[in-house]
Amino acid sequence: MAFWKPGTEKPRFEEDGEGGIVFMSNNLASSSSSSYGYANIEKQRQRLPVYKYRTEILYLVENHATTIIVGETGSGKTTQIPQYLKEAGWAEGGRVIACTQPRRLAVQAVSARVAEEMGVNLGEEVGYTIRFEDHTTSGVTSVKFLTDGVLIREMMEDPLLTKYSVIMIDEAHERSISTDILLGLLKKIQRRRPELRLIISSATIEAKTMSNFFNSSKKRHAPEGSTPGPKLEPAILSVEGRGFSVKIHYVEEPVSDYIRSVVSTILLINEREPPGDVLVFLTGQEDIETAIKLLEEEAHSNQKNSSGLLPLPLYSGLSRSEQELIFTPTPRGKRKVILSTNIAETSLTLEGVVYVIDSGFSKQKFYNPISDIESLVVAPISKASARQRSGRAGRVRPGKCYRLYTEDYFLNQMPGEGIPEMQRSNLVSTVIQLKALGIDNILGFDWPAPPSSEAMIRALEVLYSLQILDDDAKLTSPTGFQVAELPLDPMISKMILASSELGCSHEIITIAAVLSVQSVWIIARGVQKEQDEAKLRFAAAEGDHVTFLNVYKGFLESKKPTQWCYKNFLNYQSMKKVVEIRDQLKRIARRLGITLKSCDGDMEAVRKAVTAGFFANACRLEPHSNGVYKTIRGSEEVYIHPSSVLFRVNPKWVVYQSIVSTERQYMRNVVTINPSWLTEVAPHFYQNRQNAMSF
């Protein structure tokens, strides 16, 4: 594998970054790595590129209902703008400044940094809220960080978000479903609350497109004699300057194995380049663990090229202590190699990174409304993501980005922007969120990127089958309203409601809590046999959901839970989180009038409750096949994932929670069922398919 080298004929150098080669700041002498880490916090803040725009930002927010800020990676917009707003008085009189992020890890990291800069305890003046975790103090917290989804749920209690004076939607370019819903809802709220200020912030978003979206609002007519409100036309501000130049290297030929290419590039950097940490973008936990294992093998066989390397994973399922390793200073004589998902593209500032390796791929959700399968697939990234990734280098000195794809591919084949999640996802949760907020005409909702009518119709059909919507596509009472109240996937919520009638709500709420964390299992390198043996200690013949009950029971009964988790390859932090989530769900269930009862070991009741929620995900084993299943809807070919306790068991009928696509479509979290339950729990859904099934 060869790269174009700086100073040779290729790659091209372009000031505007279209080829992604060099990014220059306005004043390269404004920051130095030697003084940056030792300066006090106030001087650090003043050195950030966004600081010289402080007055302009506050003027625009004062005079415009919506301000769109395009700030390059590392400009400081995420941490500084909320502080500027507070300093300017936008949090006086009990008002709150909100800043949303698409990811939970970013919410936690950014809020901690802002609290540190303001010299306050996290959870008091500065706080954060993510699903199942609220670190705010009512009447005290004035700067609040939260996910887009949490802010949407707050609208169920306060439709006009009256406590907020300014809402900043950060990293809007990610275009998650929650971000797009939030943008549409905030546009509606502004018509009723002209005093509400919105800031749309991103590193790459097309500002004019977003401006046109907010500029298309229906004109408000102020009462005669009233004080004129802010201008409706959005203001656009570009915050330039990131610190240091970044040179881009492309491979000369396409690579056949991007994980091995990543490892060889890490070793190349370690052998030839001056000190500086490396940030690697891979697709997910499995890729990251594989790359780390290859690096460790290289360390044993070739110590010269790999000496001093300190590989660290970064993905959303890590414990807090593992996350903190990412942000700690690199030990003397070491080079941190942070192997990350696209979580490191936005918001998280990783000081010390000088080199970036971009695999060119990420995991993305894609939904097929015909087969009704939503898959997590490895897909090429967009130019916008590529620029975000390269922008992570060059924060402490001139940096380099190694792209594991050709320059021709970047310039002529890579798409400019990614497809918004709204246009490639299952919309069941989206529909119920909007219905719960009183929006009946969903097809007429003002979307930044309209979803497909096929996906919307399919979502309405599933919700009708779940008895969440009635014949008029309105929330049913009480089922629909109860499901909307639970902060869970609607299928998991329906599973909980069914458990109340089946007398197994304690068990199903436990399962729901486990499904709400990334994973309770730890994927350790080089000990696959020991891991498999540990999982077998809890394995239940009925499937993964019942296995989760065994894991939870063992955790509660363990006298030394930390050591017990270590011995059984379980994530202690995840298990603690399961206990917390379970307690919260029990409180919500009581408030909703759901009867809490244990089935005392009746696993048929548990499996039936799971089926009541996930009946649309039923599959049947193909006769005389080697583990091939066919979905009842769409007749898609699927397989049980190797991580399931039912792998190689191949029961005749199952339901699954989700599908992950690699070379095959694999079912995750699988449980055995009796096929007769399908028409019992979902007669509307299966009445037209009954003849096609051999019950």
UniProtKB/Swiss-Prot annotation:
Residues 58-223 form the Helicase ATP-binding domain. The keyword Acetylation does not apply. InterPro entries: AAA_22, DEAD-box_helicase_OB_fold, DNA/RNA_helicase_DEAH_CS, HA2_WH, Helicase-assoc_dom, Helicase_ATP-bd, Helicase_C-like, P-loop_NTPase. It catalyses: ATP + H2O = ADP + phosphate + H(+). Disulfide bonds: none annotated. ATP binds at G71, E72, T73, G74, S75, G76, K77, T78. It is an enzyme of class 3 (hydrolase). CDD domains: DEXHc_DHX35 (cd17980), SF2_C_RHA (cd18791). A motif (DEAH box) lies at residues 170-173. PROSITE patterns: DEAH_ATP_HELICASE (PS00690), HELICASE_ATP_BIND_1 (PS51192), HELICASE_CTER (PS51194). One of its GO terms (molecular function) is ATP binding. Signal peptide: none annotated. One of its GO terms (biological process) is RNA splicing. May be involved in pre-mRNA splicing. This is Probable pre-mRNA-splicing factor ATP-dependent RNA helicase DEAH9.
